Amino acid sequence: MRNLTLQRGRRQILSQLSLDLRAGELTVLLGPNGTGKSTLLKCISGEMAAQGEIRLFGQPQSQWPAPILARRMAILPQSSALSFSFLAREVVALGRLPHASGKIADEVIIQRCLQAVGAEHLADSAYTVLSGGEKQRIHFARVLAQLDEHMVDSPQTEREPTAAAPKLLMLDEPTSALDLSHQHQTLQTAQRRARQGDAVLVILHDLNLAARYADRILLLNHGQIQADGSPEEVLTAERIKQIFAFDAQVFRHPETGRLHIS
C-alpha cells in the first residue's frame, strides 16, 4: 500500500498511509476507536475505495478478478449479519463458494475448520440460536474455509499447480465476543496461519493479547501509522500514554518473560 488517503466530508480518515504486509507474519493493528483501523481493512479488501496504490500479491488490486482473489484473501468483519436459518456448518460452507473442490473435499475442509475454532459440536445447530461468541467462531471458521486451498491462484490463471503462494487473512476484532479460552484459541489459530506462510492482519484492542501473539504491531492514529515494530518496540509506557491517554505500566512477567501491560 502506498499513500492511501481517504476523506469523508471534512474528516481525514487515512492520510498518506504506506504499509507492506509480509508473508509469514502476524501483524496486529492497534489504535483508539475511530482512527481508521476497520476502514484500512476495507480498503485492502476492495470494499472501500481510497486514493493511492494497493497491490495484492505483487499485482495491482484492480487486476484481480473477484472470484480468484477470494481464494487468496479473506476478511472477518467486526459483525456479520445473517438472519436466515442456516445450520452452522452451512454458514461455514459459504466460505467454499469460490472453490470447485467438490462436495466430499468441502465437507472435510468444513469439519477441519470447525475443529480449528472449537465449534465442531455446533455443526448442526441453527445459526440464529447461537450466542454472539459462537456466531463469531462460526464466521471465523467460514473465512478459514475460504482460504483452505490446495491449488494456487494468480490474476492470469484460474489454477496453478503450486501450493506455496501465501494468502492474506484479515480479522477485525475477532475476539470481541469471546471468552478467555476462545480468545487465545482464535489467536493461536491465526498465528498458525502465519507460521504456515500466510500474511495475517488482526485488529485488536487488548494490548496484552497483542503483545503475546503479534510478530509485528502497527499503531494507527489520526489516519497514519505512528509506530511499526515488535511488541517491545511499540508498546512502551510513553507511547501508550501518548496514543491512548492512559498511564500504563509495562513490564515482563517474572515467570513467563512475556511483555505485560497494566
UniProtKB/Swiss-Prot annotation:
Keywords: ATP-binding, Cell inner membrane, Cell membrane, Membrane, Nucleotide-binding, Translocase, Transport. Its EC number is 7.6.2.-. This is Hemin import ATP-binding protein HmuV. One of its GO terms (cellular component) is plasma membrane. PROSITE patterns: ABC_TRANSPORTER_2, HMUV. SMART domains: AAA (SM00382). The complex is composed of two ATP-binding proteins (HmuV), two transmembrane proteins (HmuU) and a solute-binding protein (HmuT). It is a peripheral membrane protein. Its main location: membrane. It is found in: Cell inner membrane. It is an enzyme of class 7 (translocase). The keyword Oxidoreductase does not apply. Gene3D superfamilies: P-loop containing nucleotide triphosphate hydrolases. Belongs to the ABC transporter superfamily. Heme (hemin) importer (TC 3.A.1.14.5) family. Part of the ABC transporter complex HmuTUV involved in hemin import. Responsible for energy coupling to the transport system. The keyword Transferase does not apply. Pfam families: ABC_tran (PF00005).
